[in-house]
Amino acid sequence: MVWFKMMSAIEWAEKYRPRTLEDVVGNKKAVRDFRAWAEEWQSRIPETRAVILYGPAGIGKTSSAHALARDMDWDVIELNASDQRTAGVIEKIAGSAASMNTLFGSKRLIILDEADNIHGTADRGGMRAISGIIKGTLQPIVLIANDIYGLTPTIRNLCLEIKFGSVQSRSMVPALKKVCGAEGVYCSQEALLQIAENAGGDFRSAINDLQAAASGKEKLEVEDIGTAGRDVKENIFKAMQKIFKSTDCKKALESAYGLDESPEDLVHWIDENLPIQYARKDGNLEDIKTGFGYLSKADLYLGRVKKRQNYRMWRYASMLMVCGAALSKTKPYPGFIKYQQPSLWRRLGQTRSKRDMRDNIASKIGEHSFESMHYSRNNLLGLYSRMLKDEESAVEVTANLGLELEELMYLTGSAKASKKLQKIYDKAQKLLEEGKNETADPDFFKAPVPAVDNKQRTLSCPVIIQEEEEKPQKEGSAGKSDPPGPHSSERKQKTLNMGFDSLLETSEKKENSEKKENSGYLLVDDPKPAEKNLFSFSPSLLEKKNFSESVEQKTSSKPSKKGNPANNEPSKQKILDKVTPTESVQDNAGDGAKKAEPKNQKTLFDF
C-alpha cells in the first residue's frame, strides 16, 4: 500500500508534465525566445548552436526542452546527473549524436540536464568535452542549469542564455485547477491559491502538495491545506521589511527564526540592506553607525562559533544583528525599499569558476609533487606560473600535470587563448598521445632477462626412437643366428636435433674422425620402444678418449672381423662403466645370454 502511494505521487508529477510549449506555466518570454532559437535550426545552423536554460528548480526548464522536441518533431538524447558524465562518456554519446544526422534527415535535440554539476573526479574532463562538442555540433544542444555561474566562461560564450524565473502564484492556480478537474477532486480557489503560495514559485512542488492534500479526499478546503502542505518558510524579502520597519524586537526575531537561512547568511543580508534602508535623503547617519555597531558585535559571536564549535552562540548573534538593526533607528522610514541580495554572493558566484579552476590546478600540482591541495594552492601555484614563461618547460609542465587550455590561461594570467598558448597546449597533447611524458618503470620492476653468452656451447642429445627388434627366425634356423653381441639386430634410428643442426651433420659425416671429441651423442638401449630420452650434458665431464671409443663402438653396424666378439668385451665394459644409462645392458657374450650389471655403473645424471 505504501509502495502504491509512492508510485502514485511520482506518477502525478510526470502525468501532467507539459506536452507542448503552450502548456508550460509561466515564463512566456523565455518560452518565446527558446522557440525562436529552435526555428532557426529548421532552415540553417544558427550562429549559437547551443542554448542554456537556467533558473531555480521545478519551474519547467527540462519540461520546456522536451515539449520543444515534440513541437518540432525532433528525437531526444538526454544525459542527466544520474549518468556518468566524463569526457569519454560525453564524447561517445553526445558527441556522436551531435556529429551525425538522423535516418530521415530530422534534427536530434541533445539535452544535458544539470550541466552546472559536472565537476569532480567522477566527471573529469566533462566541461572541456562539452565545449568541444558545441563548437562542431550539427544538432541543437540544450544545457540546463540552476546556477549559470557553475558553467565555464568558454561554454557560456558559445551559448544563448535564457533565464527562467520562479512561477508566480497567480499563474499556478489555473494549471492546478485543471489538474483537479482531471483527477475528479473539487478544490476551492482559496485552497489552490494557498498551495501555490506555499510552493514558493516551484510548480512541481505545487503539484506534489496538491496530490498529498487530495489523497483519499474528493473535496479540498483551505483548512485541509494547513496540515497537508509543506513547511512554509518566511520569505527573505518580507523578513527584511519586518526587521527594518518594526520597532518590536520580538516580532523581528520571530520573522528571522522563520527564515531558512543560517545566522552566517542572515548577517550578509542585513549588512547589504542596512545602508539602503537608512542612508536616504531623510536618513540619519547615526542610525547607520549604531546599526553597524551591533552588527560587528554579532559578527564576533559568529567568529567564536566557528573557532569553538559552540553553536549556542548563534542565539546571541541573532539577537544582536536583528534587534540591533530594528532598534537602531531614531525615526520610522516609510515607503517601499527594494532590498538586494548580498553582493558578496554575487561576486563569489562570478568568481566560482575561477576558484574551482584554481583548486583543480592545485590538486593536480599536489598529486604530482606529493603535497596537499592547500599547500600547493598557497605555495606552488606561483612557482608553476613562473615555469610557464619558458616555452619548453611550459610544454613539459602542461603534459605532466594534464592541464587544460583554460587552466593554462589561468596560470599565465591570459584573458583569452593566444596562439602561443594554443601552440604549447597542442605540443603537450602530442606528447601525451605519444606517451613520451610517461615515466619509465624502475629497473627493479622489470623482469630479469638473462645475458646471452655467445661463447657458451651446449650439446643436445638427439631423441632416439628405437623400434622393436625383429622376431627371431624360424626354429630351424635358430642355430644359424647372428653372432652374439650388442649390435646383433638391425635398428632404425630417428634423430631430432635440438637446435644444433650443423653440429649433427658434422658428427654424421665424420663419425670416425677425431673431431668427434668436441661433440657427443649417446645411444641408449631402451627396452621401451618409442620412448624419448632427452639428455643434455657437457663434454668436459667425459674423458675424450673413452667418449670417442664409445661413439665408434656404438656407430659400428657390424662386429669386428679380426677377432671374436668376446674379445671386445673389456673395452665395451670400460665404456659402459662411464657412459651407460640406468637401464641394464644385456651381455650376449657366451652361449647363455646373461644380464650383467657392471659395478660402479654411472648414469648421465652422475656427470
From Swiss-Prot:
Source organism phylogeny: Archaea, Methanobacteriati, Methanobacteriota, Stenosarchaea group, Methanomicrobia
Keyword ATP-binding: yes
Binding site for ATP: G55, P56, A57, G58, I59, G60, K61, T62
Protein name: Replication factor C large subunit
Keywords from the UniProt entry: ATP-binding, DNA replication, Nucleotide-binding
Listed PANTHER family: CHROMOSOME TRANSMISSION FIDELITY FACTOR 18 (PTHR23389), REPLICATION FACTOR C SUBUNIT 1 (PTHR23389:SF6)
Subunit field text: Heteromultimer composed of small subunits (RfcS) and large subunits (RfcL).
Chain intervals with Polar residues compositional bias: 548-558
Nucleotide-binding as UniProt keyword: yes
Gene: rfcL
Family (UniProt): Belongs to the activator 1 small subunits family. RfcL subfamily.
